[in-house]
Amino acid sequence: MSMPGFSYDGGFAQYVTVPDADANLVKLPDAVDFTDAAGMGCRLMTAYHGIVEVGQIHPGDWLVVYGAGGVGLSATLVATSAGANVIAVDIADDKLALARKVGAIATINSRETDPVEAVRELTDGGADKSVDALGISETLHNAVNSLRSRGTHIQIGMTAEGPVGDVALTINDLIAKEIDFRGSFGMPAVEFRYLLNQVAASKMKPGQLVTKTIALSEVNDALTAMSTYNTVGTTVITDFTR
């Protein structure tokens, strides 16, 4: 698998090359503006595949999302547009405020409240589905433990490489509760059609995730802020003249 920004140059430019463009280049519908398109990016596509295709979310499902960064906020937006009841968990109040703006019906600051107990109370026993959008031991365990019996966990956040990224799970608990544990990675190009139809019909508005626009010359500062988790929502390059 090859991906822009990993296998070849990314898209921080007015013009980019697209290998195998007949499969990898997708025409933007006229009804989708550039802000919504930029708000989609890797994070929303990854969340869409995890929530809709892998997680098989349904209207009325209780979903708890651990992490309100790019992927977590996108998961909240996607699940809300599908009719789910979303609970967002994070340690930053500004990120939780944005989660509410894009559809979360409840938010939990896990620095102040036991998130597992809070989710169980809000859902009368446990969520139907959970997402770990971070990929660290604490959020993974809390996400799984927030589920009701026969609940489904969707693991989107990737752990660190090597032994340091290994996470031990209490398998007997998963067996006893008959938990369905599913991994989700990226989004195949074939799903673009369904995602873009949702956006074109205004059933989903990725532009809600865009909180800042910058010039190309400001990219390095933006990436530094992202690497230290000092951002909220999505930053989009709109000025390529400087």
Model-inferred region functions:
Residues 24-34, 125, 177-178, 203:
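Glycine/charged-rich beta-loop-alpha catalytic/anionic-binding loops adjacent to active sites
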Residues 55-57, 80, 91, 97-180, ...:
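Glycine-rich cofactor phosphate-binding loops and adjacent beta1-alpha1 units
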Residues 32-113, 117-118:
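Mid-domain Rossmann-like dinucleotide-binding core that forms the NAD(H)/NADP(H) cofactor-binding site
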Residues 15, 49, 64-68, 88-89, ...:
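Glycine- and other small-residue-rich loops at beta-strand/loop junctions that grip anionic moieties
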